[in-house]
Amino acid sequence: MDTIIATHELTKIFSGRAVVNRVNLSVPQGAIFALLGGNGAGKSTTIKMLTGLLPADAGTATILGEDCWADAIDLRYRVGYVPERPRFYDWMTVRDIGWFTAGFHEAGFAPRYADLVQRFRLDPAARLKTLSKGGYAKVGLALALAPDPEVLILDEPTSGLDLFIRREFLASMVELAGAGRTILLSSHGIAEVERVASHVGFMAEGRLLLAASIEELRKRIVRVRLHFDGLPPDPADLGQVLQFETSGRLWQAVLQDPNRLALDDLRQQTGIRDLEEMPLCLEEIYTALLTRFHRPEGVQATSNGRVRKSEIRDQKSEVRSKNRPGSFFPDF
């Protein structure tokens, strides 16, 4: 599958701080790629470099094989862009802003814009200043789609919209991707984009924590839950540990890239009961990735706080000590 959007070690520095730090992205043709993260994660700055509004301080960014900064003018006719807070001449009507913008584009823009206005159920005679947030966002999307772009980039497109409009807006993205367009959108509303995204990338503090297709994510990050008798298993033997906790005889861990052979062996071990492996939703994955990103080396995080790796060894030693000849019976 062709790669439409690509970055390599993309970096942007403001005031001596890397707000985008060596980001590597690969977005295939026809994908709906959701760039997810909280405010200040670096999503908007990444998008500004992709749309030619900011030069990169290091690394590269390309769309359709063209450099996003050096070839920005050529890409303007092939890439539609809707910023987080679009601003138009609010004294114009919906029809006027289309007529005005058509002067900067090739023939065909005006009739496509008129069709989109009708499709989005906008009143052509309504002044922009009278539109709701949802209506204003639809005007921005119509202007971005009217040039018939191959790629669509949306920065927080559902910010400030009510629930019904957000769902309607995101559903329209599926139609556009089905028609062959490649879409990259940023959002901090992780749960709402899960229903439409085919690929996701998680960002925090300028870094890309993980990027993959939804299908791949379901396999790469899982929650393993079990009950144990005797010695608790060491989660570090089963893959990269993002989260881990025990409560009594209940043991559970969130693992990235689980070791399948080790998990199969664990199922056969005496004293291991009710082992379950479950996929996570995007919000749970992002929480687990942030937990791993923020904790110091040598420390494992749980939902109850931080636990050092040695705690598992100490727990095992305690069990062995309780089972030595002459000791008290284990209080299991």
For every predicted segment, state its role.
Residues 103-106, 222, 291-295:
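Non-catalytic alpha-helical coupling and interface elements of nucleotide-dependent molecular machines
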Residues 8-10, 244, 275-278:
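Generic beta-strand hydrophobic packing signal
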Residues 18-22, 26, 298-300, 306, ...:
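Detector for intrinsically disordered, low-structure N-terminal pre-sequences
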Residues 22, 221, 241-242, 272-274:
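A broad structural signal for short, well-ordered beta-strand segments within beta-sheet-rich domains
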Residues 255-313, 322-332:
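C-terminal coupling/interaction segments
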Residues 2-204, 209-210:
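ABC transporter nucleotide-binding domains
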Residues 169-261:
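ABC transporter nucleotide-binding domain
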